[in-house]
């Protein structure tokens, strides 16, 4: 009796890993052992950077709000302090969008918060 080696599942598993490595250069895209390492490392970077993305966007929003606040005669920290004291609940993402897209509205917002 011939040896059963479950070739269908093995081929499917290899194909799945190789599909993830589409576009990789050289042996990183076609030699299975190298592909496995490359794909694993790529997934580690993706996991790490999904979290780093959140941090970098928050800091971008803060930079934009601070720049717009300084054009209106205050600073980011003073603006946030005044917002907390007046119970104004606008998130940083929205404030940064207003600051970039509609500076006049941001000026009005700063005046209502600070005064």
Swiss-Prot record:
GO terms for cellular component:
ribonucleoprotein complex; ribosome
GO biological process terms, semicolon-separated:
ribosomal large subunit assembly; translation
What the entry lists under Pfam families is as follows:
Ribosomal_L20
Any one Gene Ontology molecular-function term assigned to this protein's record = structural constituent of ribosome
> What keywords sit in the KW lines?
Ribonucleoprotein, Ribosomal protein, RNA-binding, rRNA-binding
Q: Please explain the role this protein plays, according to its UniProt record.
A: Binds directly to 23S ribosomal RNA and is necessary for the in vitro assembly process of the 50S ribosomal subunit. It is not involved in the protein synthesizing functions of that subunit.
- Family, similarity comment: Belongs to the bacterial ribosomal protein bL20 family.
Q: What is this protein called?
A: Large ribosomal subunit protein bL20
Organism in which the protein naturally occurs: Chlorobium luteolum (strain DSM 273 / BCRC 81028 / 2530) (Pelodictyon luteolum)
């Amino acid at each position: 009796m011939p040896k059963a080696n479950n070739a269908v599942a093995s081929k499917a598993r290899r194909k799945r890993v190789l599909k993830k490595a589409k576009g990789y250069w050289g042996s990183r895209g076609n030699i299975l052992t190298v592909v496995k390492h490359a794909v694993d490392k790529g997934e580690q970077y993706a996991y790490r950077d999904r979290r780093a993305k959140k941090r970098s966007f928050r800091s971008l929003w803060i930079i934009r709000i601070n720049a717009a606040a300084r054009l209106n005669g205050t600073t980011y920290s003073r603006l946030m302090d005044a917002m907390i004291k007046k119970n104004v609940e606008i998130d940083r993402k929205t404030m940064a969008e207003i600051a970039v897209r509609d500076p006049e509205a941001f000026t009005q917002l700063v005046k209502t918060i600070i005064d």
